[in-house]
Amino acid sequence: DHDVNRIHEGALHILETVGMGVIGNLPPGAKEMLEQGATLSDSDRILIPRAKVEDILAKTCRTWTLHGLDRDRSIEISPGHVHYGTAGGAVNIRDFQSRQYRETRLFDLYDVTRLIDTLHNIHWCYRPLIARDIVETETLDINTAYALMSGTSKPLGITLGSVESVEAVTSMFDLALGGEGQFRKTPCAHSVQGDGVPPLRYAEDRCIIKEASIRAGIPLM
């Protein structure tokens, strides 16, 4: 507990004194932070007061549900409970037939997802690999989400590459769940949307996608 507290205190100190830079223009969320108590340093870094961070953490949800397409496979996230899921985004795979490494393709994503569906000790399926045979971002995101839905009824995890993808993918989830607005009620997928770039900077384009995901009702992990 002592070490955890040291790390926590260090993070609060850095956010308040060093702050976060921005690659590009200030995204809407950053502007709201400035309106709610954050300040800009002389070097245009966003300084976030300790009290503001602590206030937000105090309001953060401690328990929630990761919904599955099959509701019996939904899982409750809460203190004291441990669940395991996939992660990453492999771009190469060892071909079963040729025994050689090659780039991952959409059918690999589907096959691996089907395997994950059968493994009892994996509780959710975040996109384990990237379909390298699809180049265009929105097309990749749509097909990735479809392959995951087709391969498992466990809770899903995705990463989206554009604002357009957010709308397209959530609309597809709506259809799978029975109609408009159903995904917002029981979101069967969460999203991992990193918005930070070393060293301690927000990337405008990633922030905008993250904000669009929040507005669309996609839970963030």
Please place each PLM-identified region on the residue numbering.
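Acidic/polar, glycine-rich intrinsically disordered N-terminal extensions of enzymes
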Residues: 1-107
